[in-house]
UniProtKB/Swiss-Prot annotation:
HAMAP family: YidC_type1 (MF_01810). Its main location: membrane. Signal peptide: none annotated. The chain crosses the membrane at residues 6-26, 349-369, 420-440, 457-477, 500-520. It comes from Shewanella sp. (strain MR-7). GO terms for biological process: protein insertion into membrane; protein transport. The keyword Oxidoreductase does not apply. This is Membrane protein insertase YidC. Keywords: Cell inner membrane, Cell membrane, Chaperone, Membrane, Protein transport, Transmembrane, Transmembrane helix, Transport. Interacts with the Sec translocase complex via SecD. Specifically interacts with transmembrane segments of nascent integral membrane proteins during membrane integration. GO terms for molecular function: membrane insertase activity.
Length: 541
């Protein structure tokens, strides 16, 4: 009985420490929020950090152009015609604050912070590796809007080089989607062959800010190759060494809680995933595509995709079979994936994420009930053996070998497995941890209301009611557990303080996570009553 309590206590403390440590390990500097808007005119950017091809090094630009504004049902984007970079992206359907009209801004370029997506052509004849600097594209207008009844919106930019070659860069936006197609069309009207190579990169300022009392999640880079399905690449690691990974397909991304931006080149192309950190403190991660040779009179099309939006697993999987891994469930992903599917299934019926959390908690607890019953049955049997075990201790004294042998004979005679109460606990832990991470990583819970005073399941309870109720439920569970007379007094005190410790620990947790834990405790209390009633009938309590 004491060993089972020890394992339960150690297990709870270990899980708590593991979750806390995982958050701290994944913590990365988060840029300070700023209310500054994007500069009205697109100032030129130094292109020294644009990746080099076999020949040609980009030079600093000197042109200045007006930004091009693009509005769809999901995105509000601004494009710098100098190079054709996306320098601003607001997510129209995701608000900065609940109840406010201001959209969540993912990409921006302000005085103190840069987070933009660049793409271009490098190589011997690349327009972004010319001594004159990056190309200054021309557009037919500066404002583009996805009209009602229109499924796609094309934003064409054109550049004519000194040799007469026409380069067209087209941004294709889609209704209801956060991915943008970037298509280059090169019409070689010159008398000489051309050689170009497409690249795409994401640049973000490495700048720390004050962290909130809620434990932070990962913010930094990530990439995928044919050999490495998913790898985080922290800013501090990027500062130490540069990536240069050849691959077929692949992708490069910047991650933060709930949101992601990513370059996804064609899966059949030979690419190189690269990274660097510029002297100005900008972290860059991106890809270099294949080198194309374009004969005189020929036309070549080169394409890639860019995603800027929430960590929507369905949308991400449609772009790459590994991009959905940015929703990182850790080593228990194989459990978390079906749990997330079930959570989505319940929400599609009830229309409330809080109710869906309750339903999935009930489902998990229901499926684990046989293990829970086995656990408490074993604990009851061990409890009934305590007087006999105490007699063995008094009989054999310090002779541990004989006492151990006698205890094993007693267990065998009474048909009791001393580890029977521990194994169910150990089997349940992975499921509960996986469910925990599903609730933490699911962007769907952001700004999702429940009922009454809970208006956002992704933030802490403003009145701390749920954590207090959770603490009360733990106290009730503890009182329902019989305490063995032989239990160490220090251990008893530690167990008594557990509800208080967990209550304080959960004060700043997202209310969705606390709701899950509270409902789980309530169900556990009911299950204990049912199990104990059955044990009393068998004379085991």
């Amino acid at each position: 009985m004491e060993s089972q309590r020890n394992i339960l206590l150690i297990g709870l403390l270990f899980v708590s420490f593991l979750l806390w440590q995982q958050w701290q390990a994944d913590k990365a500097p988060k840029p300070v929020a700023t209310e500054s808007s994007v500069v009205a005119n697109a100032t030129t950017n130094h292109s020294a950090d644009v990746p080099e091809a076999d020949t040609g090094v980009p030079a600093a630009m000197t042109a200045t152009q007006n930004l091009i504004t693009v509005k769809t049902d999901q995105l509000d984007v601004q494009i710098n015609p100098v190079g054709g970079d996306i320098v601003f992206a607001a997510l129209v359907s995701h608000k900065l604050e609940q109840g406010k009209d201001q959209p969540f801004v993912l990409l921006e370029q302000t005085k103190d912070f840069t987070y933009i997506a660049q793409s271009g052509l490098i190589g011997r004849d690349g327009i972004d590796s010319s001594a004159k600097g990056r190309a200054a594209f021309a557009a037919s207008k500066t404002e583009f809007t996805l009209a009602d009844g229109q499924d796609t919106l094309e934003v064409p930019l054109t550049y004519v080089a000194d040799n007469g070659v026409t380069y067209t860069k087209v941004f294709v936006f889609h209704r209801g989607k956060f991915n943008v197609d970037i298509d280059y069309k090169i019409n070689n009207t010159s008398a000489a062959p051309l050689q170009v190579q497409m690249y795409g990169q994401i640049k973000q300022t490495i700048k720390p800010s004050e962290s909130s009392m809620m434990m932070p999640t990962y913010r930094g880079a990530a990439f995928s190759t044919q050999d490495v399905r998913y790898e985080k690449y922290k800013f501090e690691d990027m500062s130490k060494s540069n990536l240069n990974q050849p691959t077929l397909g692949g992708w490069a991304a910047m991650l933060q809680h709930y949101f992601v931006s990513a370059w996804i080149p064609p899966a059949t192309d030979s690419n190189t995933i690269f990274s660097s950190v510029s002297a100005g403190g900008l972290a860059n991660i991106g890809f270099r595509g294949a080198v194309y040779d374009i004969a005189p009179g020929a036309t070549q099309e080169i394409s890639s995709q860019f995603y800027v939006g929430p960590k929507d697993q369905k949308a991400l999987s449609a772009l790459s079979d590994t991009l959905n891994l940015v929703v990182d469930y850790g080593f228990l992903w194989w459990l978390a994936v079906p749990i997330h599917w079930l959570l989505m299934f319940y929400q599609s019926f009830v229309g409330n994420w809080g109710v869906a959390i309750i339903l999935i908690t009930l489902t998990v607890r229901g499926l684990l009930f046989p293990l829970t019953k086995a656990q408490y049955t074993s604990m009851a049997k061990m409890r009934n053996l305590q007087p006999k075990l105490q007699d063995l201790k008094e009989r054999f004294g310090d002779d541990r070998q004989k006492m151990g042998q006698a205890m094993m004979e007693l267990y065998k005679k009474e048909k009791v497995n001393p580890m029977g109460g521990c194994l169910p606990i150990l089997l349940q832990m992975p499921i509960f941890i996986a469910l925990y991470w599903v609730l933490l990583e699911s962007f769907e819970l952001r700004h999702a209301p429940f009922m009454l005073w809970i208006h956002d399941l992704s933030v802490q309870d403003p009145y701390y009611i749920l954590p207090l109720l959770m603490g009360v439920s733990m106290f009730v569970m503890q009182k329902m557990q019989p305490i063995a007379p032989t239990m160490d007094p220090m251990q008893v005190k530690m167990m008594q303080w557990m509800p208080v410790i967990f209550t304080v620990f959960f004060l700043w947790f997202p209310s969705g996570l606390v709701l899950y834990w509270l409902v789980g405790n309530i169900v556990a209390i009911i299950q204990q009553k049912i199990i104990y009633a059955g044990l009393e009938k068998k004379g085991l309590k």
